[in-house]
């Protein structure tokens, strides 16, 4: 099984944390959110992981070079010189085939990937979107009108929606509908629907946090601290990891990875890195 992790975002909503580290390396418990994602995918049977990186991507390469990842797992890095969007970034990966997972690099979840993929195959879909219930509180009174007259008044209602979890299963045929250049995921969905392709919706009730804002980051951290076993950690948590200066000139060959400067010399931007 293969997975793609989108890890190139600027993380502007999570500042000041992301001024010095990329959002996927923000610590949740005793490890970065990116390592939570990778470990859960490996547990689900993923054998090859492609990371699309950009903002502070060198730090991601250096971190994963020393992370506790089985050497049998193949990691590939793909650089975006300019933003290509949440769907367009897939165009930097030259050999995507069959069925594969795509997910944002800032998602903490206990989703069952095996169940998600089985659902995707059952639906015979070109694309499956994992969804989660989300409540939006309106802090004002909502007025419903008709022809200039008030018909209803609802004080501070709570609205419920099904929202994307930032986790998807692609069939390779979905990639045929990518345009040249940047493309956001919603645009790809509309292109698929216009072409008559099947886009499935997987309802998920697992724990899920989109680590895109300071508030969500703090809620995710609190959940991991209270229930570490859900996320594959020991009940007694050490302090979150600290960032130390690293020597990006150092060769690291144990996992077939190289620090940023060596990778930059050996890898064409926008293409596939050595692995």
Locations of the language-model features?
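Hydrophobic packing residues within well-ordered alpha-helices of enzyme cores
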Residues: 14, 60-64, 220
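A generic "binding-loop/recognition-motif" signal
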Residues: 10, 21, 56, 107, ...
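A short, conserved acidic/glycine-rich loop-to-beta-strand motif
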Residues: 123-132
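N-terminal nucleotide-binding beta1-loop-alpha1 segment
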Residues: 1-19, 264
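Conserved N-terminal catalytic core of the sugar/cofactor nucleotidyltransferase
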Residues: 2-5, 27, 31-104, 110, ...
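Catalytic-core segments of class I nucleotidyltransferases/pyrophosphorylases
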Residues: 101, 108, 114-121, 134-137, ...
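A structural signal for short hydrophobic beta-strand segments in well-ordered beta-sheet cores
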Residues: 25, 142-145, 201
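Short, high-confidence coil segments that cap the C-terminus of an alpha-helix
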Residues: 46, 97, 124-125, 196-197
């Amino acid at each position: 099984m293969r997975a793609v992790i989108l890890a190139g975002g600027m993380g502007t909503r999570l500042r000041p944390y992301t001024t010095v580290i990329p959002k996927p390396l923000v610590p949740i418990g005793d490890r970065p959110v990116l390592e939570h994602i990778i470990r859960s995918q490996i547990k689900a049977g993923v054998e090859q992981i492609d990371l699309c990186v950009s903002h502070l991507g060198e730090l991601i390469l250096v971190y994963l070079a020393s992370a506790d990842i089985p050497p049998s797992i193949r990691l590939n890095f793909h650089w975006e010189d300019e933003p290509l969007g949440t769907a367009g970034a897939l165009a930097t990966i030259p050999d995507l085939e069959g069925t594969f997972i795509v997910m944002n690099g800032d998602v903490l979840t206990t989703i069952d990937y095996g169940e998600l993929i089985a659902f995707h195959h059952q639906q015979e879909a070109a694309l499956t979107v994992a969804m989660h219930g989300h409540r939006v509180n309106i802090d004002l009174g909502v007025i419903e009108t008709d022809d200039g007259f008030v018909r209803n008044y609802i004080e501070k209602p709570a609205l419920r929606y099904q929202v994307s979890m930032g986790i998807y299963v692609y069939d390779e045929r979905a990639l045929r509908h990518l345009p040249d250049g940047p493309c956001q995921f919603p645009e790809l969905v509309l292109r698929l629907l216009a072409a008559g392709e099947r886009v499935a919706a997987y309802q998920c009730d697992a724990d899920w946090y989109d680590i895109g804002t300071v508030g969500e980051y703090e809620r995710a951290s609190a959940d991991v601290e209270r229930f570490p076993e859900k996320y594959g950690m020991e009940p007694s948590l050490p302090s979150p990891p600290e960032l130390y200066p690293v020597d990006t000139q150092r060769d690291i060959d144990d996992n077939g990875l190289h620090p940023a400067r060596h990778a930059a010399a050996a890898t064409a931007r926008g293409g596939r890195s050595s692995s």
